[in-house]
Amino acid sequence: MSEAEYETVLPLIAGYQRFYLAEPDEDRNRVFFRRFLAPSEDGLLLGAWKGDELVGFATLYWTFSSTHAAEAALMNDLFVAEGHRGEGIGLALIQASATAAHERGMRHLEWFTALDNETAQRLYERTGAERSGWYNYELLLE
């Protein structure tokens, strides 16, 4: 995503945060997500457009896989505006994420979803990805 397109994604990011019951902080978002504008060593922010309207985004974080001794990509965020769900935009963002990770030489693309997000799980099952047998843990460090 370019600098010129950046301001258009911030309202979608806030919508994504509200979906997961987090209270958006516009100033913090503006600083944090700027690090993913291309080119970036931290990751990549991808947008999905329908005409002039930004209707979805994905955030990739560059990371590592010790078991494979290789770089990997984590699709940490995937969001499609409510009025555009079911139009293939989520699948297109996953495919664009996989392409971007592959072009960067990543071994694999991984992502997580909430256990009760069955809509997203149905989408993910269509990508050819395999469901992991791992549990995801989170330790707050505040």
Which residues does each predicted region cover?
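A short beta-loop-alpha structural element at the N-terminal edge
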Residues: 1-11
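Helix-loop element at the rim of GNAT/NAT acetyltransferase active sites that forms part
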Residues: 10-24, 66
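Active-site rim helix/loop that mediates acceptor-substrate recognition in acyltransferases
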Residues: 24-45
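Conserved beta-strand in the GNAT
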Residues: 47, 53-62, 74
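Glycine-rich acyl-CoA binding loop
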Residues: 48, 86-91
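A short, internal acetyl-CoA/4′-phosphopantetheine-binding micro-motif in the GNAT/acyltransferase core
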Residues: 78-85
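Conserved active-site alpha-helix within GNAT-family acetyltransferase domains
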Residues: 91, 95, 103, 115-133, ...
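Conserved GNAT acetyl-CoA-binding A-motif
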Residues: 101-113
